Amino acid sequence: MDATPNELSGLCTRLTAVEPAYGTVIAAVRLMWRTQGLRFTITGMENLPTTGGAVVAINHTGYIDFTFAGLPAYRRKPARLVRFMAKQEVFEHKITGPIMRSLRHIPVDRSSGAASFDAAVRALQAGELVGVYPEATISRSFELKEFKSGAARMAIAAEVPIIPHIVWGAQRIWTKDHPRKMWRPKVPIAIAVGEPIMPSLPPTELTALLRSRMQHLLEQVQDAYGPYPPGEFWVPHRLGGGAPTPAEAAELEVAELAERAAQRQQRGTGAGD
C-alpha cells in the first residue's frame, strides 16, 4: 500500500480525540514528512492484530526509523498506537522526556533491566503494542546484527505474538557516522510487516526464529526497493554499496564502546581531582 503524508490527516484527527498527546505528535510528524517529500510503501499491514498485545520487533538502521515503524499500526483499521522502548537518557532530557512520558513510551534503564522488562510485559498484558529493537543499537552495515533475547522473553512472559517489522530507507536520512539529510531528502521509505510469530519456543530458539524471519523479510524489501547506485553509503556492501561489512561494522562498534568507556573514566577521574 502506497501512502502519502496527506492521507494521514483524518487519522490524526481521530487519534487526537482518543489520545491528545499522541495525535498531536503524529500531526507534527506528518507535517515534517510532507516537508521532506517522503514517499511510503507499506506491506503486510493485515498481519498486525486488531486487538490485544503484541511485540513489534523492528530492524534498526537509523536515528528516526522508529517514527516510521509505527505507521502500519496507525493506518490499521482500527488504528493502533505503538509504545516504544527507548533508553532512559531520552526520558531524562528536558525536551524529549515530557513528550516520551505523555506518549506512554517505556524507558529502558540499562542498570536496572528487570524494571524495564516488567514494565513492557505489563503493557503487553494490558493489550498494548510494544516496539522493540532486537539489535539494541543501530546497524552500521544496514544488515541485521545479532539479536538480544528481550523481545522473545517479553512475548513468552506476556503470552503475546511477535510481529516482525522491517523499515528500509530511513538510513538515507540520518544514521551513524553520516550527516543528517533532514531537509527535503525526498526518499522512498518501505515498511513491511511480517506474519505473527507465536511464543511457543524457548527464548533462544524463538529469538533465532525471529531473526530468520526478519532476515527473509529484509531481503524481500531490499529487492523491491532497488536497483541500488554502486558505492552509496546507505547501500549494504552485499548489494554493492559503500556501507561497511558486518565484520567491519562490528569493529567500529567495539571501538566506539571503548571510546565511550574511556570518556566515562576520564570524567570520573576529573571529578575526583
Which residues does each PLM region occupy?
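Helix-to-loop junction immediately C-terminal to a conserved catalytic motif
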Residues: 22, 29-60
